[in-house]
Amino acid sequence: MQKCIMRSTEFKTHFSFHSIFSFPLSAALLALISASEPASKAFINVQFISSPLVKKEVLPFIVSFHSLSSNGILSFSPFTSSNLSIAQLPFLIKVPLLSMGSLALENFNKFIPRADLVAAWVTIIMVFTFGNFLSTLSIKTGQNLWHLSKISSSVSPLLLGIILGSQSGEIMLGKNLLITS
């Protein structure tokens, strides 16, 4: 059984983040969370303790979110500090609904049904669109609506849980991860 260990990181908002989703799902969800504090920058350092597939070497994967403007529009860019080339690394991510901050990456040899991935993307797009709508409305009206945006970003993982949740109270995300150096 393969596992992923992620070093816990703190946002400048003092929000302790202990979970990671499949990329780019991770980028979308983390951007939503980061958008609740548009002036902040979040740096997430993820280390995959690799399987025999990558010869037990450690693959650091750093995702940084840079605040572009005060309305919370963010961009992200991935950086890999390894010369490894991994083709179609399948993985199964289980996120306990009662503990959204924890994650175990297990069972590299399992795939997630495409329907689950589509449902996850639909949810993310809906919440992300709502966040952008709040940003635009805040600029036009001059009112601070970031508390609503923060609520929407907090609800995003819960919506994913409701849509993708299994009877065991866990959601499964991800399909294939392609990283090339």
Curated annotation (Swiss-Prot):
Localisation per UniProt entry: Membrane
| UniProt GO cellular component terms | membrane
Alphabetic keyword roster: Membrane, Transmembrane, Transmembrane helix
Origin: domain of life: Eukaryota
State the annotated membrane topology for this chain: Multi-pass membrane protein
Q: Which residues lie on this side of the membrane: Extracellular?
A: 36-58, 106-116, 175-181
Q: Which residues cross the membrane?
A: 15-35, 59-79, 85-105, 117-137, 154-174
Q: What else is known?
A: Partially overlaps YNL108c.
Recorded protein name is Putative uncharacterized membrane protein YNL109W
This chain's source organism reads Saccharomyces cerevisiae (strain ATCC 204508 / S288c) (Baker's yeast)
Taxonomic lineage of the native organism: Eukaryota, Fungi, Dikarya, Ascomycota, Saccharomycotina
